[in-house]
Design a protein with these regions (language model features):
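Active-site phosphate/ATP/adenylate-binding loop shared across adenylate-forming ligases
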Residues: 75-106, 203-237
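A short, basic/flexible loop-to-alpha-helix module at the beginning of a structural domain
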Residues: 168-179, 409, 511-514
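Walker A (P-loop) phosphate-binding motif
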Residues: 171-219, 532
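Acidic, Mg2+-coordinating active-site environments of NTP-dependent enzymes
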Residues: 183, 267-418, 443-444, 464, ...
């Protein structure tokens, strides 16, 4: 018999299961920064496909089809009740284990959560006050299946109003920026190295100009964050503004450049990062060069001349650029305006000489991990020289920077093992550089990383190259997502080391595998590369 108590139980189970689904999709949209192309690109990944093709969704469709033929209302009710009771049980277990996927509760997320919760509640109450029949059951399942689409539809609908708010914010920031006639703005963009270059430059310029220097906060590089920095933090005491500029599509860097009006533009490097959202490598090149193309004739462009994609694009458009002064920085070509040579790389520092075209030459020391930071230092040095600093001042300021300031840092795990935490984000250039750095350790070398995302058609080839690099430099590679695991493995096969590449996504299992690998050796190194579940990171941080 179906009684009111059982109907209330079903209502309770159904409502909480929808709240769980709501939390997940809000998390996913927030993770992808409410960017439709990034959101859709996620569903081409292994984990993204699992969101669609899984046992729970299969059972929902099966139950929906079953209802078309079954006229036994009591049986149908208990099937639906059992189904949602089990789903609620899984939700409560995840809640108890603190494994529940949820967004970071910002004002925007709180608004969306309350809106969608009201929507779910209203729909549930509407249904549950109707007659209990097969239409009732079918509507329950249909709403459940369609909820992700409803969430996405309304988020995109609200994004229209958000975009109007952003345009207004940019206009206000642009107007305020115009009031600061003597403000020197330095724009920094690139596929990689933006944040570290910004932090290095801020440290160097602050050593000379003190509180007159302002920068965008850590990892804030979208138009909204930059506009808010201008509106909320910029004041008449500031003489230099350093803005990190990021983008997932063409036109965004141009939009920010029109707002901040940079005099100096620094291009850190170009690679295939976000190829899926830009559409092509050429679009990435065009998008990143929007900063350089925005510079007026009296401006200064500072380029990473080690980067082939920058060279290629520059050669195509150099005659069309308005900016006249272009500074080339290189660790490879001695003819560059700012050049680095005589490298000595240790586990946690880099020593090298910096030479300029006018034959200034000074020793530099960076207490950072990996030779790839040298080019960042050259870009910073080139900029600081233009602002009246000398190489000795720049070298002294850079020597005071700690690895944690750049997001890639080294920690002691135990007496025999160290860990490199490089878990903010990963790109092809950074992964290769970090893997190459591991050769400085004599013991076991282990990398734990997910497959890289948003690389479009280049993804397979890039992951094969990563596999080769792991095989050359590591004793074990643990890949925690399945998307291009086989490509990584096939890359390692080139060196006959495909058995050294394994897949594991369970944090406890990963830790157990790593500990068994390093227990008999000294001078071991573990590299945690790229964004990964906090549970994995926290397990390795316990001993740190």
């Amino acid at each position: 018999m179906i009684n009111n108590f059982l109907i209330c139980v079903l209502f309770f189970c159904y409502f909480l299961v929808q709240i769980k689904n709501l939390l997940f999709y809000l998390y996913l949209w927030q993770l992808k920064e409410y960017h439709l192309k990034r959101f859709l690109a996620h569903f081409s990944t292994y984990n993204g496909k699992k969101i669609i093709f899984n046992l729970t969704n299969l059972l929902k469709i099966f139950l929906l089809c079953f209802l078309l033929f079954s006229q036994k209302i009591n049986l149908n009710f208990y099937l639906i009740l059992s189904f949602y009771f089990i789903l609620l049980g899984n939700f409560l277990i995840s809640l108890f284990k603190k494994n529940i996927v949820k967004p970071k509760f910002t004002l925007k997320i709180i608004f969306l959560f309350l809106f969608f919760t009201s929507l779910v509640l209203a729909f549930s109450k509407f249904l549950f006050f109707k007659e209990i029949n097969n239409y009732f059951f079918a509507n329950l399942l249909l709403f459940d299946i369609l909820l992700p689409f409803l969430i996405s539809f309304f988020i995109l609908f609200f994004q229209f109003f958000v975009s109007l708010y952003i345009k207004l914010l940019i206009l206000k920031a642009k107007k305020k920026r115009e009031e600061f006639k003597n403000l020197l703005v330095i724009g920094i963009t690139g596929s990689y190295g933006k944040t570290s270059t910004k932090e290095l430059l801020f440290t160097v310029l602050s050593s000379k100009f003190g509180e007159k220097v302002i920068k965008t906060r850590e990892h804030i590089n979208a138009e909204v964050g930059i506009a808010k920095t201008i509106l909320e933090n910029l004041n008449q005491n500031h003489k230099i503004f350093i803005a990190e500029i990021g983008a997932y599509e063409r036109g965004k860097i141009k939009e920010v450049s029109e707002m901040i009006k940079p005099k100096i533009g620094i291009l850190t490097g170009i690679c295939q990062q976000h190829l899926a959202t830009f559409g092509s490598l050429e679009n990435i090149q065009k998008g990143k060069f929007e900063l350089i193309e925005s510079l007026e004739a009296q401006g200064i462009a500072i380029l990473n001349w080690d980067n082939d994609f920058i060279k290629e694009r520059f050669e195509r458009i150099k005659d069309k650029l308005r900016v006249k002064k272009i500074i080339f920085c290189s660790t490879k070509e001695e003819r560059a305006d700012v050049f680095a040579k005589d490298f000595f790389v240790s586990k946690n520092s880099i020593l090298f000489k910096v030479k300029t075209k006018d034959n200034q030459e000074v020793d530099f020391k960076l207490n950072l991990i990996g030779i790839d930071y040298a080019i960042n230092a050259l870009l910073v040095a080139a900029c600081a020289l233009e602002l009246g600093m000398n190489l000795n001042e720049i070298s002294l300021a850079l020597s005071k920077i700690k690895d944690k300031d750049t997001g890639c840092y080294l920690e002691k795990y135990n007496e025999n093992t160290q860990i490199i935490f490089a878990t903010y984000s990963a790109n092809p250039f950074g992964v290769m550089a970090h893997l190459n750095h591991l050769k400085l350790w004599q013991g076991k070398k282990i990398v734990i990383m997910p497959c890289l995302i948003e690389l479009g058609k280049e993804a397979k080839e890039i992951h094969q190259k990563i596999g080769k690099e792991i095989a050359k430099n590591c004793d074990l590679g643990i890949i925690i997502t399945k998307d291009y695991y086989q490509e990584v493995k096939s890359g390692a096969k080139t060196f006959g080391k495909e058995d050294k590449i394994i897949f594991s996504s369970r944090s406890e299992e990963i830790l157990k595998t790593v500990l068994s690998e390093i227990e008999k050796d000294k001078d071991n190194i573990i590299l945690l590369e790229g964004r990964m579940p906090e549970k994995i990171i926290s397990l390795f941080k316990k001993n740190v």
